[in-house]
């Protein structure tokens, strides 16, 4: 997934 994105962006992946 978007592992290169910051934590705040990874939350959207959920």
From Swiss-Prot:
- Chief location of this protein within or outside the cell: secreted
The tissues where this chain's protein is expressed are given as: Expressed by the venom gland.
A Gene Ontology cellular-component term: extracellular region
Signal sequence span is: none
Any one GO biological process: defense response
The record's GO molecular-function terms, alphabetically, read: toxin activity
UniProt superkingdom: Eukaryota
Keyword Repressor assigned to the entry: answer is: no
Keywords noted in UniProt: Disulfide bond, Secreted, Toxin
Where can this protein be found?
Secreted
What post-translational modification does the entry describe?
A: Contains 8 disulfide bonds.
The record's similarity note reads: Belongs to the CRISP family.
The further comment given in this record reads: Not toxic when administered to crickets at doses up to 5 nmol/g.
Official protein name in the record: Cysteine-rich venom protein 23
Please give the organism: Naja haje haje
């Amino acid at each position: 997934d978007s592992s290169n994105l910051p934590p705040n962006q990874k939350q959207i992946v959920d």
